[in-house]
């Protein structure tokens, strides 16, 4: 007998066929499964996500979902809900370089408080924080007119700004109270700010992803289960599998299906038989700002 990679999940479409319980199919993870964040927006539909609104700066200002992104021109667009401190906001965005383009957290961006990546009044990007006093750090013009992954850690005593995974500045500006995620462009027609996706912590401390049922086409002897995952410190991914005769197991302990069996580690042996197989991934984190990312699962069975 020879082990072969037979069935599994490795793409967004694959994972979309499963069932989420406090987990999330994330663009941040290139289509992988993460713990559910407190707020997420993919901007992949035809309209704004539920709970988002537009506030034009002037007549003709717009914010619309176009080609898989939020595109803002002469307006502000943000959540209707406000959130307290102790959060991280991460987003993929592109600034055209026109003055007064901002993405970050604030109440309305007309008055403090705010924490934002901003073009300010020159063709350069800044990290800007403001509560009782403003503070800004010039990041230069190289970050304009191209997509980058931005992160703002809104801590109790400081604000940490990160671009493409590297911390660019820490500002000692304590900000208390409530703010909301906002994307803003200050003038109609002089350039747009584009946000592809947005995510805000805290992540759920635990969650479960249950895969669709895989069909081997006949009774087989299952050999092993392997997975690929990013597991930051304080997080974990665990897998369990079950096999059965029917294509649609019911809840609980369905007839004709084995109990869930934990897989000791990626690539470990699965001593079970049956035509159908299903896996369940348990994701956990004891750090609210971190999540593991499940990127691929492969189930192997014996063939003659």
Task: Tell what function each PLM region has.
Residues 23-26, 60-66, 113-120, 152, ...:
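Short, exposed beta-strand/loop patches in secreted or surface proteins that constitute
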Residues 1-61, 68-72, 78-83, 169, ...:
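Beta-strand-rich ligand- or partner-binding modules
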Residues 86, 145-147, 274-276:
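Extracellular Ig-like/FN3 beta-sandwich strand-entry sites
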Residues 43, 89-93, 145-161:
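Short tryptophan-centered beta-strand motifs in secreted/extracellular beta-sheet-rich domains
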Residues 128-149:
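Short, aromatic/His-centered strand-loop micro-motif at the edge of beta-sheets
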Residues 69-128:
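Secretory/extracellular carbohydrate-interaction modules
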Residues 163-180:
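Short, solvent-exposed beta-strand-to-loop segments that form ligand-recognition rims
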């Amino acid at each position: 007998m020879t082990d072969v990679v037979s069935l599994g999940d490795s793409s967004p479409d694959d994972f979309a066929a499963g069932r989420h319980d406090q987990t999330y199919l994330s663009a941040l993870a290139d289509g992988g499964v993460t713990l559910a964040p407190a707020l997420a927006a993919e901007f992949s539909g035809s309209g704004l996500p539920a709970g988002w609104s537009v506030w034009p700066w002037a007549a003709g200002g717009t914010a619309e979902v176009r080609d898989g992104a939020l595109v803002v021109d002469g307006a502000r667009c943000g959540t209707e809900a406000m959130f307290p401190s102790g959060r991280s906001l991460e987003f993929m965005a592109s600034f055209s370089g026109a003055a007064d383009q901002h993405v970050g957290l604030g109440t309305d961006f007309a008055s403090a408080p705010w924490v934002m990546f901003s073009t300010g009044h020159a063709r350069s990007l800044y990290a800007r924080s403001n509560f009782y006093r403003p503070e800004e750090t010039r990041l230069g013009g190289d970050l304009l007119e191209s997509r980058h992954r931005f992160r703002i850690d809104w801590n109790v005593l400081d604000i940490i700004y990160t671009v493409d995974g590297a911390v660019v500045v820490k500002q000692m500006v304590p900000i208390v109270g409530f703010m909301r995620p906002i994307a803003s462009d200050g003038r109609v027609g002089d350039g747009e700010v584009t946000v592809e996706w947005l995510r805000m912590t805290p992540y759920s401390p635990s969650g479960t992803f249950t895969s669709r049922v895989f069909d081997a086409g006949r009774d087989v002897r299952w050999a092993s289960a392997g997975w690929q995952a990013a597991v930051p410190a304080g997080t974990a991914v665990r897998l369990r599998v079950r096999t059965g005769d029917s294509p649609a197991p019911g809840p609980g302990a369905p007839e004709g299906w084995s109990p869930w069996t934990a897989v000791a580690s990626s690539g470990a042996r699965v001593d079970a038989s049956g035509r159908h197989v299903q896996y369940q991934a348990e994701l956990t984190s004891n750090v609210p700002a971190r999540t593991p990312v499940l990127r691929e699962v492969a189930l192997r069975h014996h063939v003659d």
